[in-house]
Amino acid sequence: MWTQMMAASGKIASFRLPPLPTIGEVIKLYKLRATKQLSQNFLLDLRLTDKIVRQAGNLKGAHVCEVGPGPGGLTRSILNAGAADLLVVEKDTRFIPGLQLLSEAAPGKLRIVHGDILTYRMDRGFPSVISKPWEEDPPNLHIIGNLPFNVSTPLIIKWLEHMANRTGPFAFGRTRLTLTFQKEVAERLTASTASRQRSRLSVMAQYLCTVHSCFTIPGRAFVPKPEVDVGVVHFTPLAQPQIQQPFKLVEKVVRNAFQFRRKYCYRGLELLFPEARRPELAEAMLRQADVDPTLRPTELTLGHFRALADAYAGLCSLDPGLAAYEFREELRLKRIIRKTGSPAPPYPPTGG
C-alpha cells in the first residue's frame, strides 16, 4: 500500500474531484445534524474551506491528516489541492458513509479512520520514509482541521507536548498544522507579550512554534451558527525550542505564573514551592532568573520564562522532592488534617 502511496507522491497529474452532491445535499441525504455535545459546526462554503487549505501551503503530492472531517467540506478542498494521501480521523459514525462516497470519488487518495483524534496514534498512520531530520525542512506532511470547540484546547496542548518530545505526528519531523479555534483561543495562541490576551497558551505555543494568525471566519458562515467567530491558525515547529527544559516542567512554571493574571508574577510563581519554604525558594528562583517579581504575568517574555524554567530546574536538581510538589495537593491534605485532627506530614518530603 505504501508503495502505491509513494508513487502517488512523486510527479502527479493535477486532480479534481468529479461532480458530487453539495455538502448541503450530503447533510440532507444522510440526515446529518450537528451535535451540540460534540461542539459541531459545519462549514458549507467551499470558498472558505479552500482558503483554509491555502494557509497550509502547497499540498501537491503531500500527505495530510484531517481532524474531524464531518460532512467533508474541508476534505474536498484538501483533495482538490492535490494531496496524494489524505487520512481523515472521524469520531462520529454518522459521517462515515458521506466520507466513503468521497473516497470512491478519489480512488487511492482518501483513507478513513473511525476513531478519536485524542487517542489515535498518528505516528503509525504514515510511512516512515516521509520523515525528515528535525533540523531540516519540515516533512511533506500536514495536519489540517476545523476543530470542534470542546476538543481544540486539549488537543493543541497534547500536540505541543508531542512536539516537545518529537513523538506522535512529530516523529516524522517538524510537521505543520493549520487549525481552526474559537476566535478568543486563536487570539490567545498568537498574543504578544503585554497584550490583553497573553496567557499560558500563548507561551506554551510560542516557545515551541512559529504561530501565525491567518484570518477570521465569521460565525454566520457555519451551520449551526456558533455564538463566536472562528480564527484560523498556522503552526510551524521551531528547529530549536526557545526553552530547553522538559515540557512538563515548562508547563508547570507557566501555569503557576498565570495563576493570578492581575497580580505580580511572584504571587503565582511562589506556589511552585511548599509553604514552609515558599518565600526563601521563590526569592532564590527569581533572583537566579533575574526576573523582577513585580512584573505582571502578561509582561513576562519568552526570555523571562526560559530563565525561570532554568532556575526552577536547578532548584529541583538540588532538591528532587520539589518537582513532585503541587500546591493544590498541599491544600487538600491541609483540609483533611483540619477535619480529622491528624498531625500534618511534610509535603512533599524534601531535602535540606
Question: Which residue stretches match the model-derived regions?
Answer:
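An accessory alpha-helical subdomain
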Residues: V228-G231, F235-P237, I243-D292, P297-H304, ...
